[in-house]
Curated annotation (Swiss-Prot):
It catalyses: P(1),P(4)-bis(5'-adenosyl) tetraphosphate + H2O = 2 ADP + 2 H(+). InterPro entries: ApaH, Calcineurin-like_PHP_ApaH, Metallo-depent_PP-like. Coiled coil: none annotated. GO terms for molecular function: bis(5'-nucleosyl)-tetraphosphatase (symmetrical) activity. Hydrolyzes diadenosine 5',5'''-P1,P4-tetraphosphate to yield ADP. Its EC number is 3.6.1.41. Belongs to the Ap4A hydrolase family. This is Bis(5'-nucleosyl)-tetraphosphatase, symmetrical. It comes from Edwardsiella ictaluri (strain 93-146).
Amino acid sequence: MSTLLIGDVHGCYHELRDLLSLADFDPARDTLWLTGDLVARGPDSLAVLRYVKSLGDSARLVLGNHDLHLLAIYAGISRNKPKDKLTPLLEAPDADSLINWLRRQPVLQVDNDLCLVMAHAGISPQWDLTTAQRCAREVEAMLASDSYPFFLNAMYGDMPNNWSESLSGLARLRFTTNALTRMRYCFPGGELDMICKDAPEDAPAPLRPWFDLDSPVREAGYSIAFGHWASLEGRSTPPQVYALDTGCCWGGTLTALRWEDRHSFSVPSRRASRHAKAE
């Protein structure tokens, strides 16, 4: 039995199946963890969602910012843009079923036996694991409720950027959503910077990648796996932190990490060239 962690798929269905074949993934035996952003930019988001949904309990995923944006489009809150290549999914006969399944997926995965945490963008350095789990459950409950369009309409925005237990309502939910699905850089005190998308070597002072700040989660012995940040190309992270987005939808690769022995697998994108961007 293996635990296979895979970075952002972004609609790259054929690469996903290539990678699972390379890693000898068997859903009857193994468990697949996905860092989110299953959809958008790649050519076949519909096939990706159908396949991952079909895996049932053999797949554990977290929602990414593009997955949340898909929910907002389907709810009529955001506009469907051609560059996202989502029209076949939005017009599919099983779209309702797929969307309702997707909005009931978590934004945080924790396995205490593996000492492993997964979130699309990472874990705020201002949080311990208990706080992260509590905040994630609040967002998940809202997404699963009949009020989810109200939340999706209010989730866009960069503030507040500083965690406090006194945060409440939509402000609290927005901070959690940004920390788990959009974060890249923080100020030295752990406050979120939602502007910079540069590679770490080009980021202006005093910004630092979130994983370069002290982390109560890592200090408690947990490792953190995340996606979202393709320009890292899986590198530049400290021990216990695993960056898995290697830019498949931009012409890079799709990467998997087998947790038990930390062996990595990758397959090339079927797209002709790499145009790495931060999204």
